[in-house]
């Protein structure tokens, strides 16, 4: 029994490390998962295309979680292939988890019967099992699974709201990498007052301002430079450090984002122009 699914990356509106409340938005950069479920075998194996040495514990745990809930003790194999760079702050783990959960549900023939929010929670549980997240990252998972902007309380895995937003986006990813599980949570908690302000801005629909305040606050908390955000500000509706870095994401209209992209190309690393994504994760 085989299943396939894709899930988008995401950018940050509000980093949840300060208060447990976070918000993110889906980006049109995909991760694809292919899952084979075999009744005659036990155990789960995994591979990540192009990264033979990468840790596959997360996606393997996603398959196991789904089979434990909806299967009958089958074994399985998962292969993911991604446009999303690993450890870059673009929610590669959430995208991989969502795609794997949906692909496994598809392989079991129950993808249409499972609520998408519940499916995202399965991936979050697997991420906690695998130790790849501090907060559970339900905000990232919800944005990737549902599309658009999602705000969540990660302490309860509670979806506070989801909204549809359409932006052009520029993504700058420096050469270095940063792992979410290594983030200095204590320093992030020191900007909790600003995080609460960001949450209020986002709840009022002022996502661009929310992003920008979040970006400046968490650049300070996580020791990333603010210069890339300041460079983008005159041309963007909002700009933020994405997740725990090192990527930055700017959003706005097409002309403004082209200007941001041009300026960010002066830096080492890679720059990508894309758009927000409203459809979320889906089987294929």
UniProtKB/Swiss-Prot annotation:
Q: What keywords does the record list, in alphabetical order?
A: Amino-acid biosynthesis, Aromatic amino acid biosynthesis, ATP-binding, Cytoplasm, Kinase, Nucleotide-binding, Transferase
Q: Is Cell membrane tagged as a keyword? A: no
Enzyme category, top tier: transferase
Q: What is its main location?
A: cytoplasm
User: What top-level branch of life does the organism fall under?
Assistant: Archaea
Record field: catalytic activity: shikimate + ATP = 3-phosphoshikimate + ADP + H(+)
UniProt-listed InterPro entries: GHMP_kinase_N_dom, Ribosomal_Su5_D2-typ_SF, Ribsml_uS5_D2-typ_fold_subgr, SK_arc
Indicate where this protein resides in the cell. Cytoplasm
Spell out the disulfide connections: none
GO MF annotations for this entry? ATP binding; shikimate kinase activity
The EC number of this protein is: 2.7.1.71
User: What pathway does the annotation place this protein in?
Assistant: Metabolic intermediate biosynthesis; chorismate biosynthesis; chorismate from D-erythrose 4-phosphate and phosphoenolpyruvate: step 5/7
Q: Which GO terms describe its cellular component?
A: cytoplasm
Q: GO terms for biological process?
A: amino acid biosynthetic process; aromatic amino acid family biosynthetic process; chorismate biosynthetic process
Which Gene3D superfamilies does UniProt cross-reference here? 3.30.230.10
Q: Where does ATP bind?
A: 85-95
**What's this protein's family per the entry?**
Belongs to the GHMP kinase family. Archaeal shikimate kinase subfamily.
**Protein known as:** Shikimate kinase
Q: Which organism is it from?
A: Halobacterium salinarum (strain ATCC 700922 / JCM 11081 / NRC-1) (Halobacterium halobium)
Upper lineage is: Archaea, Methanobacteriati, Methanobacteriota, Stenosarchaea group, Halobacteria
Which gene specifies this protein's sequence? Answer: aroK
């Amino acid at each position: 029994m085989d299943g396939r699914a894709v899930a988008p990356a995401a950018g940050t509106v509000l980093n949840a490390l300060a208060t447990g409340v976070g918000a993110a938005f889906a980006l049109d950069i995909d991760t694809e998962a292919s899952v084979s479920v075999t009744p005659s075998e036990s155990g789960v194996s995994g591979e990540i295309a192009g990264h033979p040495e990468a840790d596959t514990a997360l996606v393997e745990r996603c398959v196991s979680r789904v089979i434990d809930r909806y299967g009958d003790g089958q074994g399985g194999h998962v292969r993911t292939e991604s446009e999303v760079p690993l450890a870059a702050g673009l929610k590669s783990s959430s995208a991989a988890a969502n795609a794997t959960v949906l692909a496994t549900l598809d392989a079991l023939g129950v993808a249409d019967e499972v609520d998408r929010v519940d499916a995202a929670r399965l991936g979050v549980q697997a991420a906690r099992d695998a130790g790849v997240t501090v907060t559970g990252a339900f905000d990232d998972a919800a944005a990737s699974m549902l599309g658009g902007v999602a705000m969540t309380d990660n302490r309860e895995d509670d979806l506070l709201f989801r909204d549809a937003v359409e932006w052009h986006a520029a993504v700058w990813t420096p050469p270095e990498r940063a792992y979410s599980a290594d983030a200095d949570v204590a320093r992030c908690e020191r900007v909790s007052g600003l995080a609460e302000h960001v949450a209020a801005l986002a709840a009022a629909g002022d996502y661009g301002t929310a992003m920008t305040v979040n970006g400046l606050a968490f650049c300070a908390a996580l020791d990333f430079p603010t210069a890339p955000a300041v460079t983008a500000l005159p041309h963007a509706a909002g700009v933020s450090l994405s997740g725990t870095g090192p990527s930055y994401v700017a959003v706005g209209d097409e002309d403004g984002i082209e200007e941001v992209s041009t300026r960010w190309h002066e830096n080492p690393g890679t720059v990508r122009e894309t758009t927000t994504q409203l459809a979320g994760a889906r089987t294929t």
